[in-house]
Design a protein with these regions (language model features):
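Short, small-residue-biased leader/transition segments that mark boundaries at the very start
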Residues: 2-4
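Acidic/His/Gly-enriched intrinsically disordered linker/tail segments
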Residues: 10-22, 26, 55-186
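Short pre-active-site segment immediately N-terminal to the catalytic Zn-binding motif
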Residues: 23-42, 53-59
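Solvent-exposed coil/turn segments that connect beta secondary-structure elements
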Residues: 31-33, 46, 73-74
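Active-site recognition of the HExxH zinc-binding catalytic motif
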Residues: 40-53, 65-69
Length: 186
């Protein structure tokens, strides 16, 4: 771990940046080569800021990292923004399903500690699955349903789990969500 004194932000040695919701500060280390990769890190960390502004200080880990990964994988062109979910990531999600490694309710409802532990011990599992989930929500689910889901997440008085919240807003409920998500990556 490395600590940047002026910002009081700690980050893993290999990290290119970090965001502190408490301080509302992003730290970008400038370790990346080239403008495009540097912008990707900036988009990633800036996304954390926007998520914390919209959902508060404790958004679901998968959504926070998934949105950050989504925007990190976007490039801006003259007339459009293009997102890329890489072949490696697609293959990794397919493999997770083939090996029976995906338990969506457990993953979606997990604490940040469990999320990060799985990320560190299992070949980018958490970030890749989060990126896949957010890509599915943004690119496959009707916008109104995604908006409704975000609105439900904003209610801090709602004690229900994320999977229960999805069950409320997704047509056909959580089981249909699981089927549709898995089908998108087979």
């Amino acid at each position: 771990q490395m600590c940047i004194r002026d910002s009081n932000v700690s980050l893993p040695i290999k990290a290119s940046g970090a965001y502190s919701p408490k301080l509302q500060k992003a730290v970008i280390l400038g370790r990346e080569n080239g403008r495009e990769r540097s912008l990707a890190i900036i988009y990633h960390e800036l996304s954390h800021h926007f998520v914390s502004q919209i959902l508060g200080k404790r958004p679901p880990s998968w959504l926070n990292e998934g949105l950050s990964e989504y925007f990190e994988h976007c490039t801006i062109h003259k007339k459009a923004v293009r997102h890329t979910f890489t072949e490696y990531e697609q293959g990794r999600v397919r493999t997770m399903y083939m090996l029976g490694e995906v338990n969506l309710p457990t993953f979606l409802n997990s604490s940040q500690g469990k999320f990060m532990k799985q990320q560190m011990t299992d070949e980018q599992y958490s970030y890749i699955l989060s990126h896949a989930l957010v890509t599915f929500w943004i690119e496959s689910v009707p916008r109104e349903i995604f908006k409704k889901f975000i609105s439900v997440l904003q209610n801090k008085n709602d004690p229900s789990t994320v999977s229960e919240q999805i069950n409320l807003v997704y047509p056909g409920g959580f089981q249909q969500f699981e089927k549709d998500f898995e089908a998108a990556y087979k």
